[in-house]
């Protein structure tokens, strides 16, 4: 009788461990899916980037910045150059 109770308790403990491991695996899978979605959106944005840098984008020279922007000498980011042409 004692051995049957011991086997039953051992089986329940084993089942609890397996379920816990399964839940952890599910959480890890969910994290991987979310990471993949974020990476895909980042890649899509990078694919649509222009060859020039937008306002406050990092730069090393004026040619890096888009039209009507220039590279700020101290902070190395693109700022408005003060022009208004179309």
UniProtKB/Swiss-Prot annotation:
PROSITE patterns: HWTX_1. GO terms for cellular component: extracellular region. The keyword Zinc does not apply. It is found in: Secreted. One of its GO terms (molecular function) is ion channel inhibitor activity. Residues 1-21 form the signal peptide. The keyword rRNA processing does not apply. Its main location: secreted. Expressed by the venom gland. Pfam families: Toxin_12. Ion channel inhibitor. The presence of a 'disulfide through disulfide knot' structurally defines this protein as a knottin. This is Omega-theraphotoxin-Hhn1b.
């Amino acid at each position: 009788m004692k051995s049957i109770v011991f086997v039953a308790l051992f089986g329940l403990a084993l089942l609890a461990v397996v379920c816990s491991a399964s839940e952890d695996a599910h959480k890890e899978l969910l994290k991987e899916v979310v990471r993949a979605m974020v990476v895909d959106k980042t890649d899509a944005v990078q694919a649509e980037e222009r060859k020039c840098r937008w306002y406050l984008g990092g730069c090393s020279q004026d040619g890096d910045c888009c039209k009507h922007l220039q590279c700020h000498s101290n902070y190395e980011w693109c700022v408005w150059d003060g022009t208004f042409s179309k």
